[in-house]
Amino acid sequence: MPVRGDRGFPPRRELSGWLRAPGMEELIWEQYTVTLQKDSKRGFGIAVSGGRDNPHFENGETSIVISDVLPGGPADGLLQENDRVVMVNGTPMEDVLHSFAVQQLRKSGKVAAIVVKRPRKVQVAALQASPPLDQDDRAFEVMDEFDGRSFRSGYSERSRLNSHGGRSRSWEDSPERGRPHERARSRERDLSRDRSRGRSLERGLDQDHARTRDRSRGRSLERGLDHDFGPSRDRDRDRSRGRSIDQDYERAYHRAYDPDYERAYSPEYRRGARHDARSRGPRSRSREHPHSRSPSPEPRGRPGPIGVLLMKSRANEEYGLRLGSQIFVKEMTRTGLATKDGNLHEGDIILKINGTVTENMSLTDARKLIEKSRGKLQLVVLRDSQQTLINIPSLNDSDSEIEDISEIESNRSFSPEERRHQYSDYDYHSSSEKLKERPSSREDTPSRLSRMGATPTPFKSTGDIAGTVVPETNKEPRYQEDPPAPQPKAAPRTFLRPSPEDEAIYGPNTKMVRFKKGDSVGLRLAGGNDVGIFVAGIQEGTSAEQEGLQEGDQILKVNTQDFRGLVREDAVLYLLEIPKGEMVTILAQSRADVYRDILACGRGDSFFIRSHFECEKETPQSLAFTRGEVFRVVDTLYDGKLGNWLAVRIGNELEKGLIPNKSRAEQMASVQNAQRDNAGDRADFWRMRGQRSGVKKNLRKSREDLTAVVSVSTKFPAYERVLLREAGFKRPVVLFGPIADIAMEKLANELPDWFQTAKTEPKDAGSEKSTGVVRLNTVRQIIEQDKHALLDVTPKAVDLLNYTQWFPIVIFFNPDSRQGVKTMRQRLNPTSNKSSRKLFDQANKLKKTCAHLFTATINLNSANDSWFGSLKDTIQHQQGEAVWVSEGKMEGMDDDPEDRMSYLTAMGADYLSCDSRLISDFEDTDGEGGAYTDNELDEPAEEPLVSSITRSSEPVQHEESIRKPSPEPRAQMRRAASSDQLRDNSPPPAFKPEPPKAKTQNKEESYDFSKSYEYKSNPSAVAGNETPGASTKGYPPPVAAKPTFGRSILKPSTPIPPQEGEEVGESSEEQDNAPKSVLGKVKIFEKMDHKARLQRMQELQEAQNARIEIAQKHPDIYAVPIKTHKPDPGTPQHTSSRPPEPQKAPSRPYQDTRGSYGSDAEEEEYRQQLSEHSKRGYYGQSARYRDTEL
């Protein structure tokens, strides 16, 4: 590599002799290119981590790292863990997002060419002491690290290199480093990523890197030269406590790029400067105490620093440097134990602290080791007789107090410039803008997973990085580069007085500051809802710093937002949402002692959540979970970034990892709900298609196979804040499984003092069985009697019960086999004719989709009846257990904590509109379930198969099958009618059990029903349903058949087609909410139906005749009028399903028999048929009558 020849630099001082001991190891990087063949099952057999959006949590390295190699996979033997991925199929992987790297691997096809670099240590010969070099030498002495090992936090060389991202920052410039600046990241930023506190680095020294030098808190690194580094930036350098960049070496930058410095760096001037430096004696910590050092050997004369400039001639050239650092005794106080002991001297290199190797250890970690010493500090040091480290010219930490080594406050040792860089990666939070140079401060927390809750939130620098730097002059450069004394200490501040109301709430020692927000508020936040929000750092030069906010202040209120109990993520988001230029009023209290305790113990956020969606594992640090799991969140701003929460899974305290934050979780839950809805629509379509076929076998298969396993939708948010509380009432009991009906009856009969069945309101017109809706008031009355309410409801209704804080005990009977179900039911209920196969299949579907609703599971054994004893014990145990209740709703009970039911009834939901039968697709539509349910009427073997799908998508009308392939809106429409009736009879509920879109569907259905009279007036359709055998050949007819349409149309007792009645039936419900009897309901319905028929019968008959005439004249276009005219589409479908000729039948019965209808006996017979069809589920309009009861 060529050396820039026209600009020399003063020679660099040598390191101490121990660094040149023989047998040292040097780290080199070897580059490999491997070609992987994708396996059909294992893929490429590797796992990658890292990336710009997923940096290493210890040092912020953003390389793409091979985190795992699958044994026996395609990469086994070719790649190793912790290989750095340089290129994938010619695409550079430097400073890219993790998702981008994964995408490149996925789209590689079957072959992937991967270029990686791998670290390797080699033995190097001992370095010989070199004579002093003059200004023309172009040599840069290589510093090698002491080869120590550490058992703590992976500080050894091996653990640093083999950890994720590595504690060893190894950044050689490999081929991709020289790619053009059009890349997302240019060469001048190759070194700017690393701001770690004292990590071993293999860093390229590029000409554009001077302003990106290390900001670490305990190390200094010799960097390359930046030709853009002008006089205004010459103070932009390391401010660390333990290392600093050579000052003469820094001035060499200006000699190389500023002609004004030529004279200052002549040989004569350098010799004089060195003489002056030696004559001044040991440097002091500050100008006020120039000779406050403890006695130490005087530094010997040594050659001055030299400057070396390395320039690449090719993009793939490497600098070949490895930089290291070590903790040393920088200063000793006169009164400290170290000075009194006499065995320590300034400049001694500390090799171990209490047995822990300090190689590349940060000052923060060293301080914590010292704090844990408990009054006994054991050090292993190496004496540096030349005192190389303490005599390197550097800037002094004027803002750090001289104190005992055990009281080092490394968090306060930043110089002004370093603090500005330390917080500069807050640009992720405080602004959408990105700084051109973004130093990383991810080394603030050594144990991020255990202490992330107390990790401060960084913030963004608002101005130029070196904009406030005082230019250096030629005279006394060493001291004129020192920053001025901190201004906040100059004079006491007078804070604004908060209002009396705020003082009464927050206390008398509250201070108030008010300022106008700039680009950012300029605050780093620590803590969380468990301990409070604290100021962890203040950006210099911002209004917050000028107004007197200090580190350790607890923020109590910002503008109108109370920060007490606020999670750290919400606090950061609130500050970000304040518009630029708006006034910010902050109420704070100085609580430095509490703040120190928070940082020591790592506490921050702490709250519990319950998930209501499913999440797969995204990264190795992530947790996978399903619906209904509970977590304790300990940090809402993991790694100082928005997007992930650090959480602990309840029930497994050792399982800690990342979960999506609230906003991401809501997005994922909405996507899953949308997919679930789409799956339901497709299932409904295929169910309708199956219903149109007349084959019994296909219907059976359709019901079982096409009833897709769809998860129950929920009204809960993605994350529900929960608390663990005891239920102060007897919780309702819901049983699922093949013997649930038997178990409920057994509990109610044998233990009447403890259990009572909640009666359901009838939903079927003429039905003698209570299979409808359950009043919440009925449940409340049972609970007030200090009994468990036995509920026969759907899984969807269970979710609603949880939403309304009824906390039901949900027990699932898990069958062992289909034969076992049959054996048990025959033994427990010999008269039951339910299909064991259907019950077994239904139980399996429940177990797959609704397991998150179960609070307990009882495994059935057909050989005995021990399940009943287990059931009683389980209910008793569940009643005594604490319940995870919604935190928000629990807060609403503070006014009346004793009266549990006062809060439950305050929800306003006086009715639980849910079906008592479990439906095949687990939606709470009425009338569903068929033989699948546990408490439905037995199906005689000789009767036709009644599919639960039929009732799930009822009514099975041919016109409806054509017009609306999806029956779901009909079920929702009926539920909406029930809800409307509820709202008429009770106060508005706090929540609506059904989606609001049902209202619109209800209107649409009513409109469509009014247009379908002419189809339903077709007597041939009725004639086809008169014979009992018709139902065995195909699907049952949608309405009970009257013997004839021969009655006079003036009489009110007109046959009622089902879809006609839906619209009118609802009107009757609005007029009379409580008919006296089923017969009264029928009469009211017939009156409303008759009014509509009087107005439209003639018009419909004429249209029917015209349609038939057109069809006969133009048979080739027979289907055209049916498709274009909405009232007609049912006619061809209806006729196609009947053997008799359909087209000629409609007109004559209307014309011939309109004048005469049947007698009252026929009317009574019709009503009986109506009742029978309703019982059997054939009557498609039964839902309207059932909902009338509400």
UniProtKB/Swiss-Prot annotation:
Function statement: Plays a role in tight junctions and adherens junctions. Acts as a positive regulator of RANKL-induced osteoclast differentiation, potentially via mediating downstream transcriptional activity.
Tissue distribution of the protein: This protein is found in epithelial cell junctions. Isoform A1 is abundant in the heart and brain. Detected in brain and skeletal muscle. It is present almost exclusively in normal tissues. Isoform C1 is expressed at high level in the kidney, pancreas, heart and placenta. Not detected in brain and skeletal muscle. Found in normal as well as in most neoplastic tissues.
Record flagged with keyword Chloroplast: no
Chain residue ranges for the region called Interaction with SCRIB: 1188-1190
Compositionally biased spans, kind Acidic residues: 1060-1072
Coiled coil (residue ranges): none
Protein name: Tight junction protein 2
Similarity remark: Belongs to the MAGUK family.
GO terms classed as biological process: cell-cell adhesion; cell-cell junction organization; establishment of endothelial intestinal barrier; homotypic cell-cell adhesion; intestinal absorption; maintenance of blood-brain barrier; positive regulation of blood-brain barrier permeability; protein localization to cell-cell junction
Positions of post-translational Phosphotyrosine modification: 574, 1118
Gene Ontology molecular function terms on file: cadherin binding; cell adhesion molecule binding; guanylate kinase activity; protein domain specific binding; protein tyrosine kinase binding; protein-macromolecule adaptor activity
Organism (species): Homo sapiens (Human)
Residue numbers bearing the Phosphothreonine modification: 455, 905, 925, 933, 1131
Membrane topology per record: Peripheral membrane protein
Feature: compositional bias, Basic and acidic residues: 169-291, 415-446, 956-967, 994-1014, 1166-1175
SMART domains: GuKc, PDZ
Domain SH3: residue ranges: 604-669
GO cellular component: adherens junction; bicellular tight junction; cell-cell contact zone; cytosol; nucleoplasm; nucleus; plasma membrane
Chain's gene name: TJP2
Region (Disordered): 152-306, 408-506, 920-1079, 1105-1190
Keywords: Cell junction, Cell membrane, Disease variant, Intrahepatic cholestasis, Membrane, Nucleus, Phosphoprotein, Repeat, SH3 domain, Tight junction
Residues covered by the Guanylate kinase-like domain: 678-876
Location of Phosphoserine modifications: 16, 130, 150, 153, 163, 168, 170, 174, 200, 220, 232, 244, 266, 325, 398, 400, 406, 415, 424, 430-431, 499, 702, 902, 913, 920, 966, 978, 986, 1006, 1067-1068, 1147, 1159
Subunit comment: Homodimer. Interacts (via PDZ2 domain) with TJP1/ZO1 (via PDZ2 domain). Interacts with OCLN. Interacts with UBN1. Interacts with SAFB in the nucleus. Interacts with SCRIB. Interacts with USP53 (via the C-terminal region). Interacts with claudins, including CLDN1, CLDN2, CLDN3, CLDN5 and CLDN7. Interacts with CLDN18. Interacts (via N-terminus) with CTNNA1.
Domain of life: Eukaryota
Compartments reported by the entry: Cell junction, Adherens junction; Cell membrane; Cell junction, Tight junction; Nucleus
Domain PDZ: 33-120, 307-385, 509-590
